[in-house]
Amino acid sequence: MAGVTHSFDIGNVSVGRGQLFLIAGPCVIESETHARTLADAIQRVASDVGIPYLFKASYDKANRTSIRSFRGPGLVEGARILRAIAQGTGLPVLTDVHTPEDCLRLSKALGDVEVVLQIPAFLCRQTDLLIAAAHTGRAINVKKGQFVAPLDMQHAVLKVRDSAATLSTQSRRASS
């Protein structure tokens, strides 16, 4: 696995070819207006500096510390908002998935929208989730858990690749 580079395009963003790109947006979708305002503002800045941009927002933040915390609008409304943003801005979108069932439901709800399914850090070792995401045929970003040694992330990536996905990447972060 070391030294092997796979590249692909998601919308106007090239991944794996050494080109810097930006993933940015609100942690969670609070409203369509708020998400669209942020998408437009970030898109202007990214365009001004010549950096390709993916809009990131989650329809559900399932790992909140408190059960009373706002989690988002849910999959159906969240997918509608992500679709509206993608269609209104031309941006590809990235959003978290938390269960194997959500992978297929979200993929169907977004239809032809350019989307990256992101596996949250806390779930980066969950085999069933990685396989389900791979089976959608969508691009996948596996976020590295802080509890995972950098070299151990190859196992998550291989689970995705061995399950039919050719469009995968990983986000790195600090290790404990």
Regions found by a protein language model. Give the residues of each.
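N-terminal active-site wall of soluble small-molecule enzyme domains
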Residues: 57-118, 126-129
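Structural preference for beta-strand elements that scaffold enzyme active sites
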Residues: 19-23, 52-56, 92-94, 114-116, ...
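Conserved anion-binding
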Residues: 62-65, 112-115, 119-176
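Acidic (Asp/Glu)-rich catalytic clusters
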Residues: 13-17, 43-50, 86-88, 107-112, ...
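Short histidine/acidic/glycine/proline-rich micro-motifs that form metal-
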Residues: 28-29, 176
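Short amphipathic alpha-helices and their capping/turn segments at secondary-structure boundaries
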Residues: 8-11, 35-50, 154, 158
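N-terminal amphipathic alpha-helix/helix-capping segment at the start of soluble metabolic enzymes
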Residues: 1-22
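Glycine-rich anion/phosphate-binding loops
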Residues: 29-44, 73-80
